[in-house]
Amino acid sequence: MSPVEKPVEVEKPKVPKRRFVGKKPQNITIKDGEQPLTKTINPARHIGRVMNQIPDDILNDKELNEAIKLLPSNYNFEIHKTIWNIRKTNCKRVALQMPEGLLIYSLIISDILEQFCQVETIVMGDVSYGACCIDDYTARSLDCDFIVHYAHSCLVPIDITSIKVLYVFVTINIDETHLINTIKLNFERGTQIAIFGTIQFNPTIHSVKAKLENDTEKPMYLIPPQTRPLSKGEVLGCTSARLDKEHIKAMIYIGDGRFHLESSMIHNPEIPAYRYDPYSRKFTREYYDHKQMIDVRKDAISTTKYATKVGLILGALGRQGNPITLDKLEKSLSEKGIQVVKIILSEILPQKLAMFDDVDAFVQVACPRLSIDWGYAFNKPLLTPYEAMVMLEKDTMGDEKVYPMDYYSKDGYGRGSIPDHSHLTT
């Protein structure tokens, strides 16, 4: 086992300052002036309590268990559970959807399901950035009657999808001892630390929390924050908890990459952020330029106030786009006398939007991080639903450097609601 890690100071990248590159129109004055996501009614479907006990003939099937050994042992693809659910529903064609990093295992899983369930399988090769990309619409158009969505949590409830859905989190076992010793080395006894990660590492987070709280040598108090309806300790790139800066002294993200961690860094700029990479076992101190991000976003909001025609984009990558949010935005924009052009796009690219010459600005109902991370690269403002409502003076952006990251919270814009952000001004 490698020695425990002291945090490495990640060098801040030297990049040109981001700025909004579009130009404000000249000589134009500013004008004065719930239900679940597209629920499909299916009276024949009963959502109720089900028995969770997988039959012994599946669990103890020697041939099946040998086939499962072809998959990595530290990745839990829940093959027994999947087979049981497919057999129960008597489905004939099953769609398998997973992020690109897991596609290497897709054909093994496909062969196992075809052999032990006597079904046809279709591996969906389009990108799957998150649970919002679950593509039950495409699966149904391919005559699938069941879809297995891997590596993401149940962001889109199973009672509103067009076909039967099974979410497989693909939890990953990691070296907990190394993580525990790393935390103990870098923090004082009794420190309160927020710990979170993607759903793959959720069991690890809760296991490490219990072990450190009961550590007789150097107890630590780990707090897995929760933004309902997400699980405790789960974070998304667009949704994270607002932490109590008076008590939480640091936050630790378990996972590779920074995308999901940045959500919490944007939402909690006052709290030091650390990242533990379970693959390289490196522990690093992470930084985010909040001021630059908020300056760029405020500039885009300010520029959009001059717009007379706005392109309202509905994301068509899986279930990224929420038609209810789109309708609310269209109504609010129209009330201000702004002409609305509705656009459907699976992926929102600068060169694509540049073709809409007569549109002054865009509002996208797809992924808020697209605007936050890449909005500066578009030649016209590209606002999130939150930013559009701020521009229309129907939501709040505080003077302090806190930007809300609650898109898929229970009252978030991603669910067709308008959240309360009045606390940002206090």
Swiss-Prot record:
Keyword field: Cytoplasm, Iron, Iron-sulfur, Metal-binding, S-adenosyl-L-methionine, Transferase
Residues at which [4Fe-4S] cluster binds: C132, C238, C367
Source superkingdom: Eukaryota
A Gene Ontology BP annotation from the UniProt entry: protein histidyl modification to diphthamide
Protein localization: Cytoplasm
Catalysed reactions, semicolon-separated: L-histidyl-[translation elongation factor 2] + S-adenosyl-L-methionine = 2-[(3S)-amino-3-carboxypropyl]-L-histidyl-[translation elongation factor 2] + S-methyl-5'-thioadenosine + H(+)
Cofactor note as given: Binds 1 [4Fe-4S] cluster per subunit. The cluster is coordinated with 3 cysteines and an exchangeable S-adenosyl-L-methionine.
Main localisation: cytoplasm
PANTHER family: 2-(3-AMINO-3-CARBOXYPROPYL)HISTIDINE SYNTHASE SUBUNIT 1, DIPHTHAMIDE BIOSYNTHESIS PROTEIN
Family under the similarity heading: Belongs to the DPH1/DPH2 family. DPH1 subfamily.
Subunit structure: Component of the 2-(3-amino-3-carboxypropyl)histidine synthase complex composed of DPH1, DPH2, DPH3 and a NADH-dependent reductase, predominantly CBR1.
Protein's UniProt name: 2-(3-amino-3-carboxypropyl)histidine synthase subunit 1
